């Protein structure tokens, strides 16, 4: 029964694959929980810096920092693109890249030059053939990236802004809504659109050393760095949740395939047995 042997081989192969995808699903679920914890832990940091900057800027409105000045006409833009290093996470990266490309095409149609920085192997491989100026590449950050890992890359882009090479800097990443929903997002970093601060109708009467302007400049850079890091940890949360869902779907599909093949195998085996019985009966009748 050659057909039956082939089917049994297929069933065995699919079951082995099912074990692998099931294990990957459990690993992704564990990593997703840790990534979500890091994401939630980093949010208060951004909010606190935003609050301090809001009070400081309100108290010293005479400061006109370049990072807080709005543009009259946009001629160049820089985008920090955050993706995963690994695949097997559904359409997470593809959806983000399509969203970014639509924006890039729109910018270029309006005569706006686009420079990019890629974080993650998938973004690096995808965008290297689109003729965009890649100012920096950062990969292999792992599942638990440190804040300091991003500083060099962010500095390159901010230096481009300071030198006038780019007039606007944004970060593109997948925003984590919940386990099932991840939203491709492009968030403007500089010029800073708005700084949210509670109770902004008063300001703190502090003495700043060396002076308030230098403190504000340092905090603005730190705030931008914190926003990029927040985007990175959110993207990692999206990656792990997407991978968990993709592996669960693969595991379920493997189970369905095994059931179908087992049904086909049983039918083929039943047909073979029926044929053998018929041949035996026919042979007996002929002998009589």
Curated annotation (Swiss-Prot):
It is found in: Cell inner membrane. GO terms for molecular function: ATP binding; proton-transporting ATP synthase activity, rotational mechanism. GO terms for biological process: proton motive force-driven plasma membrane ATP synthesis. Keywords: ATP synthesis, Cell inner membrane, Cell membrane, CF(1), Hydrogen ion transport, Ion transport, Membrane, Transport. The keyword Protein transport does not apply. Produces ATP from ADP in the presence of a proton gradient across the membrane. The gamma chain is believed to be important in regulating ATPase activity and the flow of protons through the CF(0) complex. This is ATP synthase gamma chain. It comes from Vesicomyosocius okutanii subsp. Calyptogena okutanii (strain HA). The gene is atpG.
């Amino acid at each position: 029964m050659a057909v039956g042997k082939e089917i049994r081989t297929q069933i065995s192969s699919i079951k082995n694959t099912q074990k692998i995808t099931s294990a990957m699903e459990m690993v992704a679920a564990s990593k997703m929980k840790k990534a979500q914890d890091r994401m939630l832990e980093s949010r208060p940091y951004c909010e606190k810096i935003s609050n301090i900057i809001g009070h400081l800027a309100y108290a010293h409105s005479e400061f006109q920092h370049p990072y807080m000045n709005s543009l009259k006409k946009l001629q160049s833009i820089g985008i920090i693109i955050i993706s995963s290093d690994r695949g097997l996470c559904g359409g997470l990266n593809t959806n983000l890249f399509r969203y970014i490309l639509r924006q890039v095409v729109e910018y270029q149609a309006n005569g706006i030059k686009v420079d990019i920085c890629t974080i993650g192997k998938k973004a690096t491989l995808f965008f290297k053939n689109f003729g965009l100026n890649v100012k920096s590449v950062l990969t292999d950050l792992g599942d638990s990236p440190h804040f300091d890992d991003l500083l060099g890359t962010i500095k390159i882009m901010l230096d481009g802004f300071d030198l006038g090479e780019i007039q606007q800097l944004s970060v593109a990443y997948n925003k984590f809504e919940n386990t099932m929903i991840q939203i491709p997002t492009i968030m403007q970093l500089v010029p800073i659109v708005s700084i949210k601060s509670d109770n902004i109708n008063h300001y703190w009467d502090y003495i700043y050393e060396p002076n308030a302007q230098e403190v504000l400049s340092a905090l603005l850079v730190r705030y931008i760095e914190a926003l990029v890091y927040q985007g990175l940890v959110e993207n990692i949360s999206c990656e792990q949740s997407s991978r968990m869902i993709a592996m669960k779907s693969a595991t379920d599909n493997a189970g369905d395939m095994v059931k179908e093949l087992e049904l086909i195998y049983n039918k083929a085996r039943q047909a073979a047995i029926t044929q053998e019985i018929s041949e035996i009966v026919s042979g007996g009748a002929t002998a009589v």
